[in-house]
């Protein structure tokens, strides 16, 4: 059978690098052929972080960063192909998520904005690019997120198996696969790694809390945890999605101001529990029991996984590797899949998940010619 190669490009709210994956969709299940992470240079990272906070001269900075991120994504593709020695002519298309700088679907005129110019990626790689996956769903009245549940349904669903796929990036999202004729559901639960990363970066200048060791050295403060969990987002009904617009460093500092007597490691433990409790609450609303499979960076945080297991005794807990998909690359593979769906003219959103008025083919194609 002829190979069906697609590349997926993903940089999430954590901004911890550009993940690039080469995937073969010629078989029944996606096959990861090669993977590569391109580090985001510090000057570009600072520019992106500034752009995520309202300030002046945003249009000029947006235009420059759009090109810069496109160049970085193209570099990730070219390095990926060099690593696996596959010619660009063998790749049908690149699916590029881009870098989200605003996600505000709940305004009167909702919008989402990802940068990373697909024209630049196509020009510098010589491969057609499919990008801008979220805005069609928003145009149809949806949240534009999460988009991965349709991929999860096709890849992980099994009749008779009640499964939840939990993706923990900067933001955490879940996909509920009921294992019967009931609707697949999915939504953002709230912060994933974004606040625990922000706090350790601020206090210790470390990029992330490796294996949750710093959180494990602290003790959760119940008063602070209760206050954090009182954020209105956690009581919203789905479909719902969120991002740095709600859960960011400014919000965190505001929440911490009455708790400045706490030790720094106790705050880290409490922030980790915010992630775990918000996830567990939403899961228990869907079902008290089932199979839980975790992907994304959070799957590699042992303390996070331990705390989830305690909060969810009715669930078996594994990473998606138990289902044949490497948890580190699952989201990149999903965007390669979204590119394939666009190429084949097939819908890729789930209206029950996003709230869109109908299914739709997502993304636009940017030719390398």
From Swiss-Prot:
Pathway: Amino-sugar metabolism; 1,6-anhydro-N-acetylmuramate degradation; Cell wall biogenesis; peptidoglycan recycling. InterPro entries: Anhydro_N_Ac-Mur_kinase (IPR005338), ATPase_NBD (IPR043129). One of its GO terms (molecular function) is ATP binding. Its EC number is 2.7.1.170. GO terms for biological process: 1,6-anhydro-N-acetyl-beta-muramic acid catabolic process; amino sugar metabolic process; peptidoglycan turnover. CDD domains: ASKHA_NBD_ANMK. Transmembrane segments: none annotated. ATP binds at residues 12-19. It comes from the Bacteria. It catalyses: 1,6-anhydro-N-acetyl-beta-muramate + ATP + H2O = N-acetyl-D-muramate 6-phosphate + ADP + H(+). Keywords: ATP-binding, Carbohydrate metabolism, Kinase, Nucleotide-binding, Transferase. The keyword Transferase applies. Belongs to the anhydro-N-acetylmuramic acid kinase family. PANTHER family: ANHYDRO-N-ACETYLMURAMIC ACID KINASE (PTHR30605:SF0). Catalyzes the specific phosphorylation of 1,6-anhydro-N-acetylmuramic acid (anhMurNAc) with the simultaneous cleavage of the 1,6-anhydro ring, generating MurNAc-6-P. Is required for the utilization of anhMurNAc either imported from the medium or derived from its own cell wall murein, and thus plays a role in cell wall recycling. This is Anhydro-N-acetylmuramic acid kinase.
